[in-house]
């Protein structure tokens, strides 16, 4: 997680892509919309949907989330001993219920920037013996009362899989390997027996691991050069696989498109460790600011297309290195930090001033933020053939869809598009092409990595099909700020039989947000759907995100 808004000068990193052949040319070229199945047309938007027999079911980990020891994410977020809202273990029951009902499939932990100064041993064993330390990433007191084993218990309670991060800042390779042994070996070694002595006889069997966090960033504790990091990752991965050969390991990719070494970092890292890792991470945060969007809501709501481009570019680098090394292995992507984050980025919002559980990064989300989150969901599902894991950063209190106080938990506006995807998007992503009228965007005055001229479709759409359940889900974003948009769904080899649910998220005020006093200002509403048929016409409200859940004819 980047502490400061990106303002570094932008090198000509995309010149590198021009040497990657067809794949690089595709994503670097101006008409990148064509690459993701979007085309220009006039009149009603039209979506042509059909089964994609060559596409496997998407990995539901693409709808994961993130929990960092930062601000109130852990303490007073998921964990608050002594609260009347907590159970005997200190877990907030209201938060656990929300997360379990959401069905979050995987949660990344414990960081984030926090991980680069964290020693996992501080957070295990008898609680009275755990040290209180100063977290230097966020200048906050860390009591270590919630650590690895508590996180594993919490994951079991909410039905989520753990994704653990390793300290590649102050941490050593040996420390990382010991952590895997503590978590995954059953018995008979120093660290597995230590876990058993802590009351956890069965191993946690953590499959997914992040090899550090944003190690290219000057804000990161223990920042490394690309090849230095790549060699460390390779060494750690080799030793970790001796302990557990079934691990899935994620190399630390570039911290973002704003970095001067963006893509070059990824290439150099992978040239050192490609054969020892399974995926590479991507991180990105977005906001409606002068630098990023020109304070234009129209440009802001198109930022999920920047995410599309980001994914294609990093995938192109992975494939380039695969070709260089004559490897048969194809890396997948882990977009394990993404969200809207731009208001709570100042020094006061990112510095805990040596206190415990300070109010940090507590972004208040409005309707336009929720619409963009819906766009991000569409992008991630659209690219789920390459993106295996993605984590909405974060889950509770810190740039999060859920916010707590002493009385309960609040659903922010961004909760709803995320919840729809988790509840309804199942099975395979459908092969589709969308034809939509467009509006222009301009590069003038924008930060280089967001600066592009082009035309953006008013309608962004993704659809999934669950063959076993006989159901389909369609998620539709209308970026038109002023007008209703008609969308005609043309089902080519699928016949909807009934509408199971149809809802929309919109309110008159784009800046409206929820509070504990007014928790339903921005909330989903029933939406009148057309009759189920092979040709369905939806009239989407202005500035809206809409779900259609359909039963299919057997």
Residue ranges with predicted function:
Residues 1-15, 36:
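N-terminal secretory signal peptides
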Residues 31-55:
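C-terminal segment of N-terminal export signals and the immediately downstream linker at the start
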Residues 226-377, 437-452:
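Noncatalytic carbohydrate-binding groove/subsite architecture in carbohydrate-active enzymes
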Residues 377-384, 388-394, 401, 405-451:
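Catalytic cores of secreted or luminal carbohydrate-active enzymes
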């Amino acid at each position: 997680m980047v502490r400061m808004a990106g303002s570094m000068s932008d090198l000509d990193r995309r010149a590198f892509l021009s040497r990657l052949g067809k794949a690089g040319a595709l994503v670097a070229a101006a008409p990148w919309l064509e690459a993701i199945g979007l085309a220009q047309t006039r009149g009603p938007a039209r979506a042509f949907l059909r089964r994609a027999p060559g596409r496997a079911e998407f990995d539901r980990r693409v709808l994961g989330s993130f929990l960092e020891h930062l601000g109130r994410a852990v303490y007073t977020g998921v964990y608050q001993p002594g609260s009347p809202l907590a159970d005997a273990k200190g877990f907030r029951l209201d938060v656990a219920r929300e997360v379990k009902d959401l069905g979050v499939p995987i949660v990344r932990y414990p960081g984030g920037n926090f991980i680069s100064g964290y020693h996992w041993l501080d957070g295990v064993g008898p609680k009275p013996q755990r040290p209180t330390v100063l977290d230097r990433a966020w200048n906050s007191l860390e009591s270590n009362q919630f650590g690895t084993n508590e996180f594993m218990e919490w994951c079991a309670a909410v039905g989520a899989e753990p994704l653990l991060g390793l300290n590649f800042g102050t941490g050593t390779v040996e420390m990382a390997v010991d952590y895997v042994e503590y978590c995954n070996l059953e018995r008979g070694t120093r660290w597995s027996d230590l876990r058993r002595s802590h009351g956890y006889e069965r191993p946690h069997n953590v499959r997914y691991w992040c090899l550090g966090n944003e190690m290219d960033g000057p804000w990161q504790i223990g920042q490394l050069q690309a090849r230095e990091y790549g060699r460390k990752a390779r060494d750690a991965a080799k030793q970790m696989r001796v302990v557990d050969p079934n691990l899935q390991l994620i190399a630390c990719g570039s911290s973002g498109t704003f970095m001067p070494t963006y893509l070059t970092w990824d290439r150099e890292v992978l040239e050192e460790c490609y054969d020892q890792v399974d995926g590479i991470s991507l991180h990105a945060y977005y906001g409606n600011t002068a630098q990023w969007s020109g304070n234009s809501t129209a440009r802001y709501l198109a930022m999920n297309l920047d995410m599309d481009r980001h994914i294609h570019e990093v995938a192109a680098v992975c494939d380039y290195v695969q070709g260089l090394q004559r490897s048969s292995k194809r890396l997948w992507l882990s977009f394990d930090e993404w969200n809207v984050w731009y208001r709570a980025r100042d020094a006061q919002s990112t510095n805990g001033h040596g206190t415990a559980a300070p109010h940090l990064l507590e972004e208040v989300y409005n309707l336009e933020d929720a619409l963009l989150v819906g766009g991000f969901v569409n992008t991630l599902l659209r690219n789920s053939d390459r993106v295996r894991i993605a984590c909405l950063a974060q889950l509770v209190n810190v740039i999060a869809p859920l916010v707590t106080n002493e009385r309960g938990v609040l659903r922010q506006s961004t909760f709803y598009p995320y919840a729809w995807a988790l509840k309804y998007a199942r099975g395979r992503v459908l092969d589709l092409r969308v034809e939509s009228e467009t509006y222009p965007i301009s590069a003038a005055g924008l930060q280089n990595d967001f600066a592009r001229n082009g035309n953006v479709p008013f309608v962004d759409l993704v659809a999934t099909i669950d063959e076993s359940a006989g159901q389909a889900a369609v998620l539709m974003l209308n970026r038109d700020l002023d007008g209703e948009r008609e969308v005609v769904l043309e089902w080519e080899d699928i016949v909807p039989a009934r509408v199971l649910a149809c809802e929309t998220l919109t309110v008159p005020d784009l800046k409206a947000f929820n509070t504990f006093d007014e928790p339903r200002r921005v909330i989903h509403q029933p939406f009148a759907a057309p009759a189920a048929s092979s040709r369905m016409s939806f009239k989407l409200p202005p500035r809206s995100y809409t779900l259609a859940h359909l039963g299919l004819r057997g």
